[in-house]
Amino acid sequence: MKRFPMFLRTAAALALAASLAGCGAMNAQNPSSALQPVNAVPDETDSRLFLKGADVVAYFTQKQYVQGSPQFKSSHEGVTFRFASAANKALFDQAPASYLPQYGGYCANGIAYGIPWGGDADTWKMIDGKLYIFGGQASREAFELDVAGNLRLAEKYWAEEVKGSNSFWQRSKRLVFKVPHYKTGEELAAQVAAAKARP
């Protein structure tokens, strides 16, 4: 019997490990609910923790990112939300939809490209009373180059492709089959730098 070369066995083992390592996150981000897909991760106590435990109410009431506590949490559509206080939990429980970030808490700039990238809870923006999360400062700045245009694109791709889909497969599809307006991170960074350089 012919043996597989070492590099093939190593590659197969790495592929298997990578696929198994992603199962927890893949399951957490794709609950069987109206929130699918959602920016959630498993942790020690919760299998689908939204935005790594950021208090979604605090963005509206305190106008800042605040980390929630496991002491104050609610479940909505199969996803766990944490809050910094009992008061914030009560506000959420009265009207959860009022406090949910757009696009399941994924990076709004990524959604404009049809790609559900994880959002960074401390990089956010309120636009017309709605909460948008971004993957980092560079992503937010790129989105702000054309807020109206990027919102139109994000709404289109969220409605037509991302909402209700499996985040992993959608991300994989759009990383291979890019949208017509796709720009690399370097191209976006150059546009942001040029915009900042203008008087």
Language-model regions, residue ranges each:
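Short, solvent-exposed recognition patches
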Residues: 85-100
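Structured alpha-helical
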Residues: 16
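Bacterial N-terminal signal peptides that target proteins for export
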Residues: 2-12
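Short, well-structured hydrophobic secondary-structure segments
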Residues: 78-85
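C-terminal motif of bacterial Sec signal peptides marking the signal peptidase cleavage site
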Residues: 19-22
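Intrinsically disordered, low-complexity terminal tails and linkers in eukaryotic proteins, enriched
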Residues: 24-77, 98-199
